[in-house]
């Protein structure tokens, strides 16, 4: 039985195994508090996220189960990875992941980025999205604050399919709305991986300009700002809007022509503007894919088709439509945690068997 240590962080009890020391608050993550800590087993710094009251409602239990399944399944250099998971005596769940020093939001608010950093960051975002999309996973909430970066400029995407709780400590917190694809904003019938490409385009534009591209005050204002730059959506896109109220609103907007992005991004080179033009397209079907973006000339300095892997298998979403009681989600969660530790233990045993005797 693991030994647990208690600490008070922001008035919240953190119960962690004795494997971890030196807890420091980092902020609020998706429905949980995040601390940095020292992993005494590996001597690495890690991030520990406490999922608060994961079994209080079926919705929370399902959301926690989904995050656990995603963290277990997604294994890629540009995606945050799980290094440990445990349930405390108080039945809170703790996810342990690698710790990166900062995020793109903090970088963008501190100083302008040079071209080679913009290219390298965008390359890594697209490399991560190629893998994630190949697994049948859509991020849905891509924004600078959930793109983590370390001192070597290695980049990892975090918080998949989850809404991040606003951190009260973070001044000038950027709204998710700025990066949201029009098909989500206007509740079109169906959306898919293309929403992440739109968000990545907004992030790319912000790296180029140093400020958000579409800083809407609300959804109506947001859509209006988008049409000022990209013009009125084409009729075949407008006709896919299911809600009559939304349809009426879009049709009431003045007709606008798409503005050439080179007029707005005067300091960016032509290949950057060309890639951005292909990402910020109203029709999701005509938006560039992550795989295509990796082959674009703007990312040529980093593109290596032999080192841009796809997922070995699709993520199993079969649980996502399930409407189950808390106790069932709890049993399923315990099973996943046991499976994770069994796989980790067998991997370590195999590694030990491979090590030749001294």
Swiss-Prot record:
The active site is at residue 141. It is an enzyme of class 2 (transferase). GO terms for molecular function: ATP binding; MAP kinase activity; protein serine kinase activity; protein serine/threonine kinase activity. Its cofactor is Mg(2+). Signal peptide: none annotated. InterPro entries: Kinase-like_dom_sf (IPR011009), MAP_kinase (IPR050117), MAP_kinase_CS (IPR003527), MAPK_p38-like (IPR008352), MAPK_Sty1/Hog1 (IPR038783), Prot_kinase_dom (IPR000719), Protein_kinase_ATP_BS (IPR017441), Ser/Thr_kinase_AS (IPR008271). A motif (TXY) lies at residues 171-173. Residues 20-299 form the Protein kinase domain. ATP binds at residues 26-34, 49. The keyword Nucleus applies. GO terms for cellular component: cytoplasm; nucleus. Its main location: cytoplasm. The modification Phosphothreonine is found at residue 171. SUPFAM superfamilies: Protein kinase-like (PK-like). CDD domains: STKc_Sty1_Hog1 (cd07856). Its EC number is 2.7.11.24. It is found in: Cytoplasm; Nucleus. Keywords: Activator, ATP-binding, Cytoplasm, Kinase, Nucleotide-binding, Nucleus, Phosphoprotein, Serine/threonine-protein kinase, Transcription, Transcription regulation, Transferase. Activated by tyrosine and threonine phosphorylation. GO terms for biological process: cellular response to oxidative stress; osmosensory signaling pathway; stress-activated MAPK cascade. Dually phosphorylated on Thr-171 and Tyr-173, which activates the enzyme. Phosphorylation is induced by fungicides and osmotic stress. The TXY motif contains the threonine and tyrosine residues whose phosphorylation activates the MAP kinases. Belongs to the protein kinase superfamily. Ser/Thr protein kinase family. MAP kinase subfamily. HOG1 sub-subfamily. This is Mitogen-activated protein kinase hog-1. It comes from Neurospora crassa (strain ATCC 24698 / 74-OR23-1A / CBS 708.71 / DSM 1257 / FGSC 987). The gene is hog-1.
């Amino acid at each position: 039985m693991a030994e647990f240590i208690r600490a008070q962080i922001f008035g919240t009890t953190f119960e962690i195994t004795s494997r971890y020391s030196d807890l420091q608050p980092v902020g609020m993550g998706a429905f949980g508090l995040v601390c940095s800590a020292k992993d005494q087993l590996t001597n690495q710094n890690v991030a520990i996220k406490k999922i608060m009251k994961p079994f209080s409602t079926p919705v929370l239990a399902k959301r926690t189960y989904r995050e656990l399944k995603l963290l277990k399944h997604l294994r890629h250099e540009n995606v945050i990875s799980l290094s440990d998971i445990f349930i405390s005596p108080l039945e809170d769940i703790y996810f342990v992941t690698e710790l990166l020093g900062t995020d793109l939001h903090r970088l963008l608010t501190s100083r302008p980025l040079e071209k080679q950093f913009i290219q390298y960051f965008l390359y890594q975002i697209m490399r991560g999205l190629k893998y994630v999309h190949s697994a049948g996973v859509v991020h849905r909430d891509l924004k600078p604050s959930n793109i983590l970066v370390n001192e070597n400029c290695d980049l990892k995407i975090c918080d998949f399919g989850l809404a991040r709780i606003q951190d009260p400590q973070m001044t000038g917190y950027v709204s998710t709305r700025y990066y949201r694809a029009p098909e989500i904003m206007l509740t079109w019938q169906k959306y898919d991986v293309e929403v992440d490409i739109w968000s990545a385009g907004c992030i790319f534009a912000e790296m180029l300009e140093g400020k958000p591209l579409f800083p809407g005050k609300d959804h109506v204002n947001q859509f209006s700002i988008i049409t000022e730059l990209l013009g009125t959506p084409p009729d075949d896109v407008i006709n896919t809007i299911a809600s009559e109220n939304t349809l009426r609103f879009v049709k009431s907007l003045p007709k606008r022509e798409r503005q050439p992005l080179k007029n707005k991004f005067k300091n960016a080179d032509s290949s950057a503007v060309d890639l951005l033009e292909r990402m910020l397209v109203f029709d999701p079907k005509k938006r560039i894919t992550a795989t295509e973006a990796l082959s674009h000339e703007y990312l040529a300095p980093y593109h290596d088709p032999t080192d841009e892997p796809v997922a070995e298998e699709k993520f199993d979403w079969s649980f996502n439509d399930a409407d189950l009681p808390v106790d069932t989600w709890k049993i399923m969660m315990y099973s996943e945690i046991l499976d994770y530790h069994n796989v980790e233990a067998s991997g370590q045993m195999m590694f030990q068997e491979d090590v030749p005797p001294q």
